[in-house]
């Protein structure tokens, strides 16, 4: 009985190639998901929130609407925003600045605990 060695090599070669392709593809997609800069304590990060997420009215049809919006924003920062930062960023202290029209409201560095 004569066995053709090329047949076995061909099948083995194709099987290995198929298995290797899936492994390479998995490694490629995993690399895409986890690659990127690793945040360090000295890095600055900007968090953008939609206006609707601030709980503020988008339109205030009254005189002095800037003052009203500023007061509402300060209440929001004190009651909600610091808890969001504590929950999602697990950090203890950093400055929070929000640009509102032409003025900047800055919350002092505080330990969020």
From Swiss-Prot:
GO terms for biological process: ascospore formation; mitotic recombination. Disruption phenotype: Displays increased levels of spontaneous RAD52 foci in proliferating diploid cells and exhibits an absence of G1 checkpoint in response to linoleic acid hydroperoxide (LoaOOH) treatment. Partially overlaps IDH2. Disruption phenotypes caused by deletion of this gene may also be a result of a defect in its overlapping gene. This is Putative increased recombination centers protein 14. It comes from Saccharomyces cerevisiae (strain ATCC 204508 / S288c). The gene is IRC14.
